[in-house]
Amino acid sequence: MLLSIHIPKTAGVSFRRILAQLYQEDFLLKYWQMTDARGQVVSTVPLNVRCIHGHFSPESMLQAYPQAKLITWVRDPVERVISSYYHRLRDPDWQHPVTRELHEKKLSLVEFAALDLMRNEMSRYLGTRQPKDFAFIGRTECFETSLARFLQMYNFNQVPVPRENCNPQRTSAYYPVAASVRGKIAALNERDVAVYEEYCQSLTESEVVSV
């Protein structure tokens, strides 16, 4: 069993499409609800499932599946917050309280980053887990390289690389945000910055360039 932890804005939707293609009927999503490969809501995990992907903490799932292998993706914390900000402006999920507050109060990027739910979000998903606890860690900035490593590890053939939830207005690898703003966002996410650096140390040389 693979437990794929989808930290928001780390290319988790693109990776989800790939996992669904690879595992087909043996794939399950766990977000607000659990849904099987056909999109049907299920109350329990079917016995055939070999991969679960979604927004959940490692501890919550490892209690039920102690032998499962953890996999996840990490992203530069500042870029991740900026991406979340523009995504919520562009494609709002009105069920989420942060999205409602963003639009109702017309928050700036820094004001959005200062919200409690937006600070150190990556750390909250990973909990007390260390890099050694994960069978695979991908880096969003090197998505194709990380994906190739994942496919090789699990003996899958190459697959087309989808690009889901990408900002169509972003024309370069990084958002054009002032250094002073980046510094403020980094300061609001000190734990995430430390976690990101620690996790990147476990990656291959081709994936840690510019960390």
Where do the protein language model's features map onto the residues?
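Aromatic-acidic/polar surface patches that form glycan- and anion
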Residues: 5-8, 12, 63, 136-143, ...
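A short, charged/proline- and glycine-enriched loop
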Residues: 1-2, 66
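N-terminal pre-catalytic "stem/leader" segment of glycosyltransferase-like enzymes
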Residues: 2-34
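Amphipathic alpha-helical segments that form well-ordered structural scaffolds
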Residues: 14, 18, 145-149, 153, ...
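Short, conserved catalytic/metal-binding motifs centered on acidic residues
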Residues: 11, 76, 192
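PAPS-dependent sulfotransferase catalytic core
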Residues: 51-58, 159-211
